[in-house]
Amino acid sequence: MDQFNLKNYPIYANFLNKLAKDLTKFYYKKLDKPFKISNKLKGKGYDPVTTSDKAFEKFIRSKISKKFPNHQIIGEEYGHKNTKSKFSWVIDPIDGTRSYVVGNPSWSNLISLNYNGEPYLGLANFPKMKKYYLNTSKN
């Protein structure tokens, strides 16, 4: 599955649908508790990162790597897993970390599946609100 083909859409859409549900369960079982915060910028401003950001990204990476071991993964907290695949997954484990820190439920997990650098499918998952949105850029 390293070729762009709309026939493969259900494989990726089903994966992301299940991942959204798994991420919400993961949040309530493992992360709905106190967390540690650090500053990614080290004295040149403030860009918070939490232990939850890192845990979410590790969880997402493990799910993607298990299902699509040859795909590239680009994550905000742990960088790039390069492969020769034309598929890449781009992860923002907690979009809205500042909202997460203060308890505002509007934060989300953002995941994009790209092919040759172009978006193919995207997931915006809101675990605290138990909602998610899946969208494609293809017809």
List the model feature ranges, each with a label:
Residues M1-I94:
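N-terminal subdomain of lithium-sensitive/metallo-dependent phosphomonoesterases centered on the IMPase/IPPase/PAP
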